Amino acid sequence: MAGGDREKALDAALANIEKQFGKGSVMRLGDEVRAPLEIIPSGSIALDVALGLGGFPRGRVVEIYGPESSGKTTVALHAVANAQRAGGIVAFIDAEHALDPDYAKNLGVDTDALLVSQPDSGEQALEIADMLIRSGALDLIVIDSVAALVPRAEIEGEMGDSHVGLQARLMSQALRKMTGALNNSKTTMIFINQLREKIGVMFGSPETTTGGKALKFYASVRLDVRRIETLKDGTDMVGNRTRVKVVKNKVAPPFKQAEFDIMYGKGISREGGLIDVGVEAGLVRKAGAWYTYEGDQLGQGKENARAFLRDNPDLANELEKKILEKLGVGPTVDQDVAELPAEPIGVGDF
């Protein structure tokens, strides 16, 4: 077929597709500049920098996993609070039946406006999530956790019954349905997941996440959260030092790390993160135990500097803005990549 005939045939095919499926069903990527990805701040400037965009991407699936008490739910609740501050509507699907409203309120969550569901089964949880996504009204949905999404057949069965692959098939089916709807509605979906160990692994890490391989494929961002140190004030334990590895990122360069402090009862220390990242970026000067910013002494020792920034929110906001500008953090048009998995998911993946 000659070049001109091929173009005519393609134009006719595109016209038929648009007539049948609507305008924009098929388009050339170069025809129109895509808008930058919208984001929901994570609550930690170090994590925002590691994510490359300044937060969690809108319209995508995010998986947060790690050992028990590592800070997974805390990170998710900070995202909830930030989405609400921007005027967004958020749902929290509490499959573990373990949400602490008082702790969530301490982190800045508007618990009165938060939609909460405590489903009876995995099918019910994912069906509720799907209906909320398709309403187009939600900005963020958190599911805590994948391990607690127990299939109905397992709940109704006997204790010793075998249910191989049931949960993996449930997750695979749900994610196939929801991924496109998430992108259309610009709803971010955060799955909190637990770690398990494979038996008989001789080489490599024996750790794996629950729920099969589908979530690994469909997630645009995967975060590995670990507690690395206990923070003390004298002999009192006041918090944890947490490290987050971005093990997968389809919207910015992956494999970056972030460290931040989680204070007991208060959540992620925003001011501590500003000090740490400010020192790394060269905006905050550390001389001995003293921290200074543009000639202003923030305090002697990190705790005093943290308190100074807490008492001076305008200065903290200015420092945050300068850090993000200097590090070039923010959504860009050409960082977005394909949304679908690079390889198909087969029966052997369950």
Swiss-Prot record:
GO cellular component terms attached to this protein's record: cytosol
Classification of source organism: Bacteria, Bacillati, Actinomycetota, Actinomycetes, Propionibacteriales
Residues that hold ATP according to the record: 66-73
Matching NCBIfam families: tigrfam_recA
Similarity comment: family membership: Belongs to the RecA family.
Function (record text): Can catalyze the hydrolysis of ATP in the presence of single-stranded DNA, the ATP-dependent uptake of single-stranded DNA by duplex DNA, and the ATP-dependent hybridization of homologous single-stranded DNAs. It interacts with LexA causing its activation and leading to its autocatalytic cleavage.
GO biological process terms, semicolon-separated: DNA recombination; DNA repair; SOS response
Domain of life: Bacteria
Localization of this protein: Cytoplasm
InterPro entries referenced in this protein's UniProt entry, alphabetically: AAA+_ATPase, DNA_recomb/repair_RecA, DNA_recomb/repair_RecA_CS, P-loop_NTPase, RecA-like_C, RecA-like_N, RecA_ATP-bd, RecA_C_sf
Residue stretches in coiled coil: none
GO molecular function, one term: single-stranded DNA binding
Encoding gene (name): recA
Keyword DNA damage in annotation: yes
The protein, known as: Protein RecA
Keywords per UniProt: ATP-binding, Cytoplasm, DNA damage, DNA recombination, DNA repair, DNA-binding, Nucleotide-binding, SOS response
